[in-house]
């Protein structure tokens, strides 16, 4: 949201006269993406914490700012304005600044554990990509629009291209059921940032300190296997199938000698997880629920 589609919209706006065909193609991609990406935002302005580079914080809303910059009205301007304004208010209510007023490394509070190997003290300032909204002319309709709530969205929304099922609760929070996302180049805590069974806009997720004790491994929304004092979790999937009737199926192996078949099935008030474990030796399995916020 704050990378490929963001830069594509910059190109679409700046090059719409010189390269109209490509610019329109990028705008159309953004229209399609927006109709799915809106499911990542909760009613209070928070976005789903998922994946890497989370220390960029309110860059999460930069896509919507780029939509306005490129004049792509997927939803009414009041809806887009509401997404942006609520998002900023949510972030600025969190302890994300140090005593000098500088952005800290972390997510909703200072937290080095969630950071990437490529992060540095100035990394959080990628959040300022969202300030692209300040490039809108005074006559842009977004400034005149009245802030609106999110439109009525499906309580369950399927994203087959990313092997995700998005759930929207009546209180406005968002859950993503996931399987199959994997970063081949192994960023820090790739399993925790991409391969948990569920991610939630309120509860967030844990990153481990180590895998040698259960409290340090903290496998929230994961199935962990203990072997010789070490905990193993899902890092990647061998097979993934998404079926609207059966749910999200994955076959994975946390270590040699163990294979697991997992099915995630969404319901109106939550989801069900079913695991079939094939193990060549005795082991201890531990499953975690959502972490405390």
PLM regions and their residue ranges:
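Aromatic-lined, polymer-binding surfaces characteristic
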Residues: 1-65
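Low-complexity, glycine/alanine/valine/leucine- and proline-rich hydrophobic stretches
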Residues: 151-237
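Active-site-adjacent bridging/hinge elements
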Residues: 33-41, 95-107
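Well-ordered alpha-helical scaffold segments within catalytic/enzyme domains
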Residues: 4-19, 60-75, 112, 126-138
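C-terminal, beta-rich DNA-binding module of retroviral/retroelements integrases
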Residues: 124-144, 156-157, 161
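C-terminal, helix-dominated tail/subdomain
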Residues: 52-73, 84, 103-125
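Extended, well-ordered alpha-helical scaffold segments
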Residues: 18-40, 75-91, 141-156
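Extended repeat-based interaction scaffolds and adjacent low-complexity, acidic/S/T/P-biased segments
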Residues: 206, 210-293
């Amino acid at each position: 949201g704050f990378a490929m589609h963001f830069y594509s919209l910059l190109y679409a706006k700046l090059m719409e006269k010189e390269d109209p065909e490509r610019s329109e193609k990028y705008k159309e991609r953004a229209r399609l993406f927006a109709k799915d990406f809106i499911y990542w935002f909760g009613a209070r302005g928070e976005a789903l914490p998922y994946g890497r580079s989370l220390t960029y914080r309110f860059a999460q809303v930069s896509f919507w700012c780029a939509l306005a910059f490129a004049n792509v009205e997927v939803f009414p301007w009041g809806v887009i304005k509401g997404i942006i304004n609520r998002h900023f208010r949510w972030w600025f209510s969190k302890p994300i600044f140090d005593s000098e007023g500088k952005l800290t490394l972390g997510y909703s509070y200072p937290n080095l554990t969630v950071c990437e190997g490529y992060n540095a003290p100035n990394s959080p300032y990628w959040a300022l990509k969202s300030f692209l909204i300040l490039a809108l002319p005074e006559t842009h309709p977004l400034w005149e629009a009245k802030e609106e709530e999110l439109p009525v969205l499906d309580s369950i929304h399927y994203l087959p291209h990313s092997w995700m099922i998005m759930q929207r609760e009546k209180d406005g929070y968002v859950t993503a059921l996931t399987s199959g996302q994997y970063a081949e180049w192994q960023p820090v805590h790739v399993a925790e940032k991409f391969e948990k069974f569920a991610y939630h806009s309120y509860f967030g997720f844990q990153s481990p300190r180590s895998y040698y004790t259960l409290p340090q491994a903290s496998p929230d929304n994961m199935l962990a296997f203990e072997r010789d004092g070490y905990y193993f979790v899902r890092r990647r999937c061998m097979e993934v199938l998404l079926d609207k009737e059966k749910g999200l199926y994955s076959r994975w192996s946390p270590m040699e000698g163990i294979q697991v078949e997992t099915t995630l099935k969404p319901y109106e008030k939550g989801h069900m997880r079913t695991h079939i474990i094939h193990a060549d030796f005795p082991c201890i399995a531990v499953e975690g629920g959502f972490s405390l916020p």
